[in-house]
């Protein structure tokens, strides 16, 4: 029978390859949009921060995107997904690199590459930017959420979170898609149990 240490090592290696490099709470960074600027985290666990200035054209673009979601919470979540995609395409202007999907083993410390701490922190900063401009009608921004701690068979993973008028929380997880791709938006209650290494760690 494999030793406990060997099993733990395999779990840790699998988690590092498929999930977050760090178990740091992404909410601790406190990054928000200050005026028209957002500090974009990258390099894994927010090692680097690059300032992105969102101008008047960006504000109009976000307003147009979110206007399409005013009819219902479901429509707004779809609009939020499009807003995240646009925001990520803008972040490339300051990182200079197109972030690959998920976390690549060995990419820690590489400028422009993002783990789930970077992704969830950046997404929350955007959501707060939208909220401050009253572009969100059906949702408010909640604290980021985390799941997994290796010993339960899951890799560490973080996500941004929104809450609808009924109090239901929704994960806004941009980690799985490449930069500019649509984030996964699903009930947080469904997001929390996912991420078992036995299933490939990519569900």
Residue ranges and their predicted role:
Residues 79-139:
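Mid-length scaffold segments of soluble, non-membrane domains
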Residues 9-18:
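Bacterial N-terminal signal peptides
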Residues 128-191:
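Hydrophobic/aromatic-rich core segments of domains that either
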Residues 192-203:
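Low-complexity, Gly/Ser/Thr/Pro-rich intrinsically disordered linker/tail segments
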Residues 21-24:
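Bacterial signal peptide processing site
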Residues 41-47, 52-71, 97-109:
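Acidic/histidine-rich, surface-exposed loop or edge segments in extracytoplasmic proteins
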Residues 1-9:
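Bacterial N-terminal signal peptides that target proteins for export
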């Amino acid at each position: 029978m494999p030793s406990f240490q060997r099993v733990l090592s395999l779990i840790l290696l699998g988690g590092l390859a498929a999930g977050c490099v760090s178990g740091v709470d992404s909410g601790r960074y406190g990054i928000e949009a200050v005026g028209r600027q957002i500090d974009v985290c990258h390099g894994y666990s927010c090692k680097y921060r690059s300032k992105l200035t969102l101008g008047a054209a960006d504000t109009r673009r976000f307003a147009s995107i979110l206007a399409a979601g005013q009819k219902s919470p479901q429509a707004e979540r779809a609009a939020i997904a499009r807003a995240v995609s646009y925001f990520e395409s803008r972040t490339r202007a300051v990182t200079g690199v197109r972030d690959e999907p998920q976390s690549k083993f060995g990419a820690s410390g590489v400028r422009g590459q993002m783990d789930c701490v970077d992704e969830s922190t950046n997404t929350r900063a955007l959501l707060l930017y939208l909220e401050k401009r009253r572009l969100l009608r059906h949702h408010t921004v909640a604290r980021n959420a985390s799941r997994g701690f290796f010993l339960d068979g899951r890799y560490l993973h973080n996500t941004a979170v929104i809450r609808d008028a009924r109090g239901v929380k929704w994960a806004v997880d941009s980690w799985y898609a490449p930069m500019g791709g649509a984030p996964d938006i699903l009930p947080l209650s469904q997001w929390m149990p996912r991420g078992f290494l036995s299933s490939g760690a990519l569900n």
